[in-house]
Amino acid sequence: CEKEGIEDPRKQQLRYIKQIEQLRAEVQGSFLEGYYDEIIRRLELGEIVKSPDMEDVDFFRCLNAVVNLKKSLWMRVFSAAVLNDSKRFKKDYEKKVVKVLVRSPLYEEGMTDDEILSVHGILSYAQVMEWKGPLLYKLKGGQEYIEDKAREKEYEIDTSQNQYGTVINSQTLERAFPVSIKGVQRIVTIENKANYEEMKYREDTLYLFCHGFYSPKERIFLKRLMEVAEGEIQYFHWGDMDMGGIRIFRFNKKNIFPKLKPYKMDREAFQEALERGAGIPLEEKKKEKLEKLNAGELEELK
């Protein structure tokens, strides 16, 4: 019989199973289904699950909210929306949520917590998109009236006139839609800011600054470039020749440009960089990780 105030263990397990099944139903088709399936199996085997804390409803609320996010949000805005407290997510749940997000197909080994959250749409730093090249995009904003009916205004902005580059912030990025990259034969993402700045404007090339792992907003914008491209386009990535550069190349190829090829990231370029005095000795642990890393087309850099 149940003692007063103490829940019967069997009933508690059944309650937990039902709770997790409901959470799983909210994230159908996502990697979290597998995470919740594991918890259910543990509960069905009679395990007393302590990690995660089954009574911490807010943790599960945060987890599902991240996966179901429709647009990028600042971390404090997300925290206020989900927990009614702008600082609580960072204080109580950031580390716990990140620990689960490493299961996501968007995860690349070595990502920082900020990068993991950013690729899922939780932002902790200013987000801008930078490029050089003949990109025409449509921007929605404001209202106009046609026959007394209000509709959202649309503007077409031709950035081919910005010979030294174009920069748009996160609000603009959210409302911008690429319309044309007429004449472009190559799209090149460049990880190093100095290298990006040195590139001269070319009518046949679109240079994109790659600050790291692209966020959801940026990935949507970049994928649309492929939809409006005319003819056969070549895709290249010029990144740092280290573990981070390899991971960013893999991420961009897997999640944005399937035909992406490395640019100036071969053995010859690596040797030239060493001769110029670039590079630092690798710690033994990092060296071991690099040797185990599946570098794909960049295998020779290992």
Annotate each PLM feature.
Residues Q234-F236:
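Pol beta-like nucleotidyltransferase catalytic core
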Residues K253-I256:
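C-terminal, helix-dominated tail/subdomain
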Residues W238-G244:
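Extended C-terminal subregions enriched in glycine
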Residues C1-F209, Y214-V228, E232, G244, ...:
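Nucleic-acid enzyme cleavage-core boundary/entry regions
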Residues M265:
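Active-site donor-binding loop signature of nucleotide-sugar glycosyltransferases
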